Amino acid sequence: MMRLNWQIRQVQLLLERLGLQQLVWMDCLVMMLNKAIFLDRDGVINKRLIGDYVKKIEEFELLPNVREALIEFKKMGYLLIVVTNQQGSKQFLIFYNL
């Protein structure tokens, strides 16, 4: 349990250091046990398009510090899962790997 608490604190510190407190992720304990982080897409990991949503890779722009945070999370052994409720994802208009 002590090791788990240390890992949870490391995630919290990383988010604070990178200024990414707005990341949408599950309860820290559940996240640590399952080693997955769920991230919302538009406005959390990438720049939101006003009045629209990102449909093409050319429109996709990571927000500051996100790349570094994702790399650190991967190093810590997390599975990164990007979620979205954007209409295009249901219509299979959005296809790309980050």
Curated annotation (Swiss-Prot):
Instruction: Give the species.
Output: Methanocaldococcus jannaschii (strain ATCC 43067 / DSM 2661 / JAL-1 / JCM 10045 / NBRC 100440) (Methanococcus jannaschii)
Q: Which GO terms describe its biological process?
A: carbohydrate metabolic process
What are the GO MF terms of this UniProt record?
Answer: phosphatase activity
Which InterPro entries did the record assign? Answer: HAD-like_sf, HAD-SF_hydro_IIIA, HAD_sf, Heptose_bisP_phosphatase
Out of the domains of life, which is the source?
Answer: Archaea
Q: What is this protein called?
A: Uncharacterized protein MJ0015
